[in-house]
Amino acid sequence: MRTTYMAKPNEVERKWYVVDAEGQTLGRLASEVASILRGKHKPTYTPHVDTGDHVIIINAEKIHLTGNKLQDKIYYRHSGHPGGLKETRAADMRANKPEKMLELAIKGMLPKNTLGRKQGMKLHVYAGSEHKHQAQKPEVYELRG
């Protein structure tokens, strides 16, 4: 009888991928990138082991939001002090911190535990078309759809 393959942390082969966010829809891009970060695109995927790859996202400032989300979507954060609730519209977020907008969308799709935090550290987002990871020889990842 065969047993199910379980990846071991020291056996995991990690690749680096570059994803161009220009013209891509925020949620559709985020769900594919989250899947790569978790390692679900590999046949060696194991739920309790970090089998994911590194993902570099460029052109985050050119991400697309459907409908009226650019004006209507609001990001909330709290300082921890009474009356410290802050809100930012999606249009302002895309203009000032486009990297943060993508990071929030992708990290929201990862597990809320230590493994998810570790997987989130393999995400590298840049507003422009330049990134500083040429030494890792990243491959261009073509998104489905």
Curated annotation (Swiss-Prot):
UniProt keyword Ribonucleoprotein present: yes
Biological process according to GO: negative regulation of translation; translation
Cross-referenced CDD domains: Ribosomal_L13 (cd00392)
A GO molecular-function descriptor: structural constituent of ribosome
GO cellular component: cytosolic large ribosomal subunit
Keyword NAD recorded: no
Gene3D superfamilies documented for this protein: Ribosomal protein L13
Keywords: Ribonucleoprotein, Ribosomal protein
Highest rank taxon of the organism: Bacteria
SUPFAM superfamilies the record matches: Ribosomal protein L13
InterPro entries xrefs: Ribosomal_uL13, Ribosomal_uL13_bac-type, Ribosomal_uL13_CS, Ribosomal_uL13_sf
Entry similarity comment: Belongs to the universal ribosomal protein uL13 family.
HAMAP family membership: Ribosomal_uL13
Function comment: This protein is one of the early assembly proteins of the 50S ribosomal subunit, although it is not seen to bind rRNA by itself. It is important during the early stages of 50S assembly.
Assembly and binders: Part of the 50S ribosomal subunit.
Protein name: Large ribosomal subunit protein uL13
